[in-house]
Amino acid sequence: MKRPFKRILYGGDYNPNQWGKEIWKEDMRIFKDARINSATINVFSWAKIQPSEETYNFTELDEIIDMLSRENYDIVLATSTGALPAWMVKRYPEVARTDYEGRHHKFGQRHNACPNSPVFQKFASRLAGKLAERYGDNPHVTCWHISNEYGGECYCENCEKAFRVWLREKYQTLDELNKAWNTEFWGHTIYDWDEVVLPNALGDGIEDAAEPHMTAFAGISIDYCRFNSDGMLNNFKMEKEAIRRYDKETPITTNMMGTFKGLDYFKWAKEMDVISWDNYPAYDTPWSLVAMRHDLMRGLKDAPFMLMEQTPSQQNWQPYNSLKRPGQMRAQSYQTMAHGADTIQFFQLRRSVG
């Protein structure tokens, strides 16, 4: 594998396709003035690249990559699979997630695909492979960015079937499963693998629980979380394998989220060439907590990591977006470097149109 980076990367997510091309040239000028040397692109462009099941269109992405290559940028190229296109949900409704309440979703938002959908896996792997085939030999592509901020859950029939398979591989026998879950409690003894149901509001979920997604059986809940993490990791590995068919050397990553509990990051780290994560402290987040998260990320591989995202301004999911005081963004970035980062990147280099 190639050495991840020959220089400290300074840049961030760049989505020029949101703007007219007359803005692109100006971006290159002002980015150079700001000494920006890298851009993360194509994070949410699946619908643009693949407007229908049979059609791929790389024309605009070709232009963006050519422009950045001419300016000697390090390109972090994403696979776009963090948000699937509307046509896929319309034609294959099973790719959409079913939530904890048992509601099957329509198209919308992001992180919106069932991780155990064979249809989603097929299209995601195919797209990753096509991107690697087209751009894998570009020397300016210095890192592959698979999907985006893996997380969330699905409780559909595909997931339930996959959960049973996962449990059989783990426990081998129903006796071992019943023992591990203490199913004697409340008369929950399982006599057939098909009797296992997902731990959501339609099954063992506790109504009006103090914490969301609580269930009556901790063992079932913990195993579901492990299964869900493994399922998403399997998707990451599928895309990684598709990339490696055409690009054997460029480092591959996905952006983690610090102390996010939903995934087993220690297990994920074994499959990643370099760790990357997104740092979005709130106005009242202790700096010591941010430091601990940096150390956690560095410790996953005992090696330098990438700061894939941070922001000088706002996030659409924070209850409050406080203005950072003068020098605070610089101090936050220096703290990141001091804890072992090889990159300082932002979301976004140019704000969205709306």
Residue locations for each model-derived region?
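Aromatic-lined substrate-binding rim segments of carbohydrate-active enzymes
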Residues: 25-105, 129-132, 236-246
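Polysaccharide-binding and catalytic clefts of secreted carbohydrate-active enzymes
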Residues: 102-274, 278-292
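Short, well-ordered coil/turn segments that N-cap beta-strands
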Residues: 5-8, 35-37, 69-75, 137-142, ...
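Short, solvent-exposed turn/loop segments enriched in Gly/Ser/Thr/Pro and often Arg
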Residues: 15-17, 42-45, 78-87, 142-151, ...
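Conserved, mostly hydrophobic/aromatic
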Residues: 12, 31, 39, 68, ...
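Hydrophobic targeting/anchoring helices
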Residues: 253-354
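Boundary/entry segment of secreted carbohydrate-active catalytic domains
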Residues: 2-23
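Surface-exposed, active-site-proximal loop segments in enzymatic domains
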Residues: 45-59, 87-118, 157-160, 217-221, ...
